[in-house]
Structure formats: C-alpha cells, structure tokens
Amino acid sequence: MEFRTALDAIFAHDLAQDAVRISASNTRGSQRDEAKTAFSPQSLLDGDYDTYWTTDDSVCSAEIALVFAESQTFNRILLQEYIPLGQRVERFRVDVFDENGLRRTIARGTTIGYKRIVLTEPCTTDNLYIVIEKARACPVLNKLALYMDTITQTTP
C-alpha cells in the first residue's frame, strides 16, 4: 500500500464525531451557557481551525470528556492546539473507563503544539477523558479526534 493511501485510510473516520456528548470541567464564559459560548468544547469536533475550546484565564488545568452511546475502539488520538495564541500545554494524559468500569490512564504526554498524534494500544471505551494537567496559560485546543489504525504495526 502506498504511503498516501495508507494515511487516507487510517484517518478516514474520526470516531470522536460519534460522541453523544462532549463537555469540559471549565469553559471560558460557561457561567452563561457552555453550549452557547464561543469557546465551547463542541469546537473541538467542528472541523474549523479557527474555533477552539479554552478555559477562563485563571484556569491552567482542565478535563475534556467524550461520552459515546456505544463503545469505540481506537489506537490514535489526535490533539491540536490553536497555535496563533501560542503553545501552552506542558503536560496531559488520556484516561478511559475500562471494561471493568474503572478509570485508567492509557497515555501521557508533554507538549501538544500544532498537532500531536498519540499512539496507544487498541482501546475500547464509551468514556474518554483528555486531562490537561499543566499549561503555561489557559489551554486552547481546536481539535480532538480518534482513529483506529489497522494498517501499520506501530505501537507505543
């Protein structure tokens, strides 16, 4: 399989789009209505580079939760910061609820930058959490995506 064809196949279906709910522990302007604020976590799924989720200025750690009606299996997590406002995230982790209903960490990382694709073992869950543990300023993310790579043999 050619490289371009393989990439197109791996990133063809964003499983995060199948989420029935996305929420955040803090959203700028959420005291009004999280769903209506310009900085809603929904911005992570809208495909528009210039829309983004962010927290209030004083909040430098936060959690984003994706909930699915049915369990999803993935092994690639794409995170993207809105770089026009600067690279801010210094440390993050990805948590899921496992088959026993226990929350566990499946990946950890430092900076995200323009785009970070986190490689994991195949994971099946109906609840996924992106936990921003530390940031230089309020985190500003504009994309969250999940993929299942069945082509390459690369694992973490």
Predicted regions mapped to residue ranges:
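Disordered, acidic Ser/Thr/Pro-rich linker "stalks" and the adjacent N-terminal cap
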Residues: 1-70, 74, 82-88, 147-156
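Trp- and acidic/polar-enriched beta-sheet ligand-binding modules for extracellular glycan
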Residues: 57-62, 72, 83-152, 156
